[in-house]
A protein has these predicted regions:
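Short, solvent-exposed alpha-helical "recognition" segments
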Residues: 313-316, 364-370
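Short alpha-helical "recognition helix" segments of helix-turn-helix
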Residues: 348-351
Length: 370
């Protein structure tokens, strides 16, 4: 296709962003790097603010860990103050599905949501394994299991051992979803489908859900990121592995860059995905996490701990219990209400404020007069 384009007898202009190359797994190539045209920089964006531009720029500088010297100039000229269109963006299908489940279970009054792309695809891992395969294995219905790997397992215990041996993040998440919700899963998925609006009614959605691949080119007033992207600490660990794939790691950086630049106004981002030297601003909200990623934890352990509800609180429950009885200030109340209005899960707010989930719910009940 590129060859056909280049051979046209006309003035030719290629417009793109090298750092938004995220489809290498589909064997997509970056056309900008395969031509010798004169290069003109478009370094200003009128979508997002200077603070978001600085964040995005510093994320791209992580490519130095891959031996690159990114020559990037990025300026934010956006002045949007609207906060109507809200989106949750994840790196993986299952990370997004977990957040969507949390959202509708915690917000019973939500009537309309929207998924970019096919909703059914979010129940699958990248390798094709289905959430229903794991559920059928747990229920002893192996005849209904289609995935060849899961079909080899005689029980959930075998699957759990396989996950530990292979460090399969997405399969680990599937197993934990099944453990958490069990036979309630079909009803939950049906609830998601019932609330999902058609394309022409997307403007009615109270929350839009998307993986970063599906929302490339999109923009939203407010964006919250699920904590399943690769941060700098994890990137440095992955670079040092014997089987490290520089092109894949380059795309992992690009994925986070694309995700943070979807916002027109507010961005809620876990602190372990924030480069050093970046602090919160009125539009950039840094969500505290349990702790920075540690080399001693496997990817599966980190991913599972990022999503599960009460399980994520075990390591800090004693300290959180102490904090639950400390005085709330006007500033903290305002931040809590804003995060709740944005649809941030109670689990995430609990970690951010270092309080129990019960303490968060109790405070919200008082502030909202429920």
């Amino acid at each position: 296709m590129l060859d056909v384009f280049i051979r046209q007898q006309a003035t030719k202009i290629l417009v793109g962003d090298t750092h938004q190359q995220i489809y290498g797994w589909r064997n997509a190539v970056n056309s900008l790097e395969n031509t010798d045209f004169q290069e003109l920089r478009l370094s200003a964006s009128f979508r997002f603010s200077p603070q978001i531009a600085t964040l995005a720029h510093k994320i791209l500088l992580w490519k130095k860990h891959l031996g690159q010297e990114p020559d990037v100039k990025l300026f934010g000229r956006g002045k949007n103050t609207a906060n109507k269109v809200k989106a949750t963006i994840a790196r993986t299908n299952l990370g997004l599905l977990l957040r969507a489940i949390e959202f509708i279970k915690e917000n019973k009054n939500i009537k309309h949501i929207y998924f970019e792309g096919n909703l059914n695809s979010y129940t699958y891992a990248d390798d094709g394994a289905s959430l229903y395969d794991v559920l059928n294995l747990q229920n002893g219905k192996k005849r209904l299991v289609r995935d060849p790997i899961i079909k080899q397992m005689s029980s959930v215990d075998d699957l759990e051992e396989y996950i530990k041996q292979t460090d399969d993040v997405q399969l680990g998440l599937m197993l934990e979803i099944v453990k958490e919700y069990g036979n309630e899963i079909p009803k939950i998925l049906q609830d998601l489908k019932d609330k999902h609006v058609a394309n022409e009614d997307k403007h009615k959605a109270q929350m839009i859900f998307s993986t970063v691949h599906r929302c490339k080119g999109m923009e939203y007033d407010s964006v919250q990121l699920v904590n399943d992207f690769v941060g700098e600490e994890r990137l440095k660990v992955m670079v040092d592995k014997d089987d490290a794939d520089p092109s894949r790691l380059n795309e992992e950086i690009n994925l986070l860059y694309v995700a943070v630049t979807r916002t027109r106004n507010h961005l809620y981002i876990p602190e372990n995905l924030v480069p050093d030297g970046i602090g919160p601003t009125p539009s950039l909200h840094i969500l505290k996490t349990e702790k920075k990623e540690k080399d001693s934890n496997t990817e599966t352990d980190r991913a599972i701990r990022s999503y599960l509800k009460e399980k994520t609180q075990r390591s800090s429950v004693n300290e959180a219990s102490k904090q639950s009885y400390q005085k709330w200030t006007k500033e903290l109340d305002a931040e809590l209400l804003q995060m709740h209005d944005e649809g941030i899960p109670t689990r995430v707010m609990s970690t951010h404020f270092n309080r129990t989930t019960g303490g968060i719910r109790s405070r919200l009940k008082k502030l909202n007069g429920w």
